[in-house]
């Protein structure tokens, strides 16, 4: 029994897809356990970029099983489109498995997402308008439609009619918006269900059987710890649990079967959407990092907010997700800066604090306390070992490890597979 969980430790976009793809080479099963097509994974293979939103990064290994777990909310239309995209690129998807217990995103979820966001005005959360939140709302309210329901024509029709009656009353009376007709959805989405039917199964059985047989299973998180609905910057969060604990709920695998948790972070910080961001940069340094790092959302295309590395955020993520190993990405983006900074603590009303406050009002008053380190001017994109890094870059990497309190297992100096350097094999230490 060998399993590794990959989680983002910041606000998403840390490069989880790349690290998952990298670790997938030694895994036999790769599974997603939460989120939906609001997540964006960019994988570079032979200098070619592939962008995925629903399907696990392991799909590029035809000999490995890729799983969409029960904790994922699935937009059938997006999934069918993504499958077609992969097929056009010559990628087989015969190794994909989809949980019959996963909940389905339907057009009324997307419409409600948009109407709710518009109604918030200046207090908007910054949702991707993908229907993720409303789908999880229906799940919690026990009125959601699952993949198993989508495949049964009669059950799908019955539940869709019931849900539309309720949602349309909401659209018309609360939002003064046009209703959605049953005929606009039913045949189209039932058709999508039939297209994905061959992939649908009880994925909990597949995952547990694999673990019991001693196979290596990799769990792939979406978004990041700071977007977790319980442990993140609530309410500026996603509607699921990206933390490692979400694996057990979202995949049907017990906590005793989790061996390692790899936390993925960038050498700086970024986030998309609204919400607190203590180390955010508004100057030319921030603009430089954004452009060199290509900091634009995979899903939304929106410019990401960027800032210095925040070890307070990282220690919070380490604690609530039980991180055992760190994967540090995008060190190359900081090349050319005379000075680099790391936030080591916050100043809250004149008092130094080392933890991340739950209160948004307190966070607004938090000022980062920085430790400054000398930068480096060398091009490090071809570096293949820690020793080959310039001394200042090497010191920066080591200082991050010290402040976070987790050993760094890999560091990357670019988007390519060959630009990921191993300091310690995650699989070998299990």
Swiss-Prot record:
Binding site for IMP: 13-16, 38-41, 128, 142, 223, 238, 302
Cellular component, GO annotation: cytoplasm
Molecular function in Gene Ontology: adenylosuccinate synthase activity; GTP binding; magnesium ion binding
Pathway the protein takes part in: Purine metabolism; AMP biosynthesis via de novo pathway; AMP from IMP: step 1/2
Alphabetized UniProt keyword annotations: Cytoplasm, GTP-binding, Ligase, Magnesium, Metal-binding, Nucleotide-binding, Purine biosynthesis
Gene Ontology BP annotations: 'de novo' AMP biosynthetic process; IMP metabolic process
Active-site residues annotated for this sequence: 13, 41
CDD domains named in the record: AdSS (cd03108)
EC class (word): ligase
Keyword Oxidoreductase attached: no
Gene3D superfamilies for the chain: Adenylosuccinate Synthetase, subunit A, domain 1 (3.40.440.10), Adenylosuccinate Synthetase, subunit A, domain 2 (1.10.300.10), Adenylosuccinate Synthetase, subunit A, domain 3 (3.90.170.10)
Localization terms from the record: Cytoplasm
Main location: cytoplasm
Cofactor annotation: Mg(2+)
Known EC number: 6.3.4.4
Disulphide-bonded residues: none
List of residues binding Mg(2+): 13, 40
Subunit structure: Homodimer.
UniProt cross-references to HAMAP family, sorted A to Z: Adenylosucc_synth
Family listed: Belongs to the adenylosuccinate synthetase family.
Protein name: Adenylosuccinate synthetase
Gene: purA
